[in-house]
Amino acid sequence: MIFGIDVASMLLGGVAAGMVLFIVSVGLSVTMGLMGFVNLAHGGFAMLGGYAIALAMKHWGLGFVPALVFGFVVTAAASAVLERLLYARLYRATELDQVLFTIGLVFMMIASVTLLIGPENQPLALPAILQGQINLGITQYRTYSVVLIVVGIVIVSGLWLGFERTQIGAQIRAAVDNRRMAESLGINIARLFTITFAFGSGMAALGGGLGAEFLGLDPQYALKYLVYFLIVVAVGGLGRVTGVFYAALLIGVLDFVLKKYVPQGGTAFIYVLTILLLLWRPQGLFGAKVT
């Protein structure tokens, strides 16, 4: 019985961590699939959004949910401006140029936050209703983790419906599958790029705030978890919302279990598995087969 409770707790913890990975990574998957742009600054938008949420709660007295909305909107708006002013100039550049630009942008984000706020971890105070534990029958588990799982399910359901049942979702899917054909059908690709990039960055900000309780929130966040976000995208497939969801859950649970039983080598094991997977299926587990 004790073993069953321990397994259930680990699975719940891994699923909750996977939800955070999904919320942050889904925007990166869609923007990379749509734009073909290697955006290593995505973790930076998650970090900046998390800071916006934490500071809005701490200094302006915003509640948790309004602060999440604030962080999403501010980050999405700022990223839309950056996309038009800077990113758009590099869409036809080499991948090396894109990598150098975005990694330089990350270093600027880290340096700016460190200078203005400091290098310390930024606490994010949860409301009382999300603290404590909830009875799940076989075990007691943190209320916030359970809520986070529910929020993740709601988000993936909403995104799936948005991509499958709305006009802009159809346009994004068409552009991801065949950009030239989408352009020939009259789809405004530049406008679509800006909207998608802003939304993806806003989702990263939301994940940065929601996941601060698990991952912490400091200036190095922008680089610290970047590899995990890229792994989720690689395993889930570019532009695949449900693929990223399943990949995030898989990586979240695997990471949680391995760090408990193999704390010194768990992360390295995930890296090795990812390399082997991509050698076998370069498009990822859930990506469309490359022809």
Show the residue positions of the predicted features.
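Helix-loop-helix "hairpin" substructures at the membrane interface of multi-pass membrane proteins
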Residues: 17, 139-217, 241-246
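Cytosolic-side transmembrane-helix boundaries in multi-pass membrane proteins
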Residues: 6, 85, 116, 177-184, ...
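Transmembrane helix-bundle core of multi-pass membrane transporters
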Residues: 89-90, 94-165, 192, 262-264, ...
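Transmembrane alpha-helical segments in multi-pass inner-membrane proteins
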Residues: 21, 25, 61-73, 194-274, ...
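Membrane-interfacial amphipathic/re-entrant helices at transmembrane-helix boundaries
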Residues: 1-23, 52, 64-67, 93-99, ...
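Membrane-embedded helix boundary and interhelical linker motif in transport proteins
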Residues: 12, 34-81, 85
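Hydrophobic core segments of alpha-helical transmembrane domains in multi-pass membrane transport
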Residues: 50, 54, 72-78, 105-114, ...
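Alpha-helical transmembrane segments within multi-pass membrane transporters and channels
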Residues: 61-106, 112, 246-251, 281-282
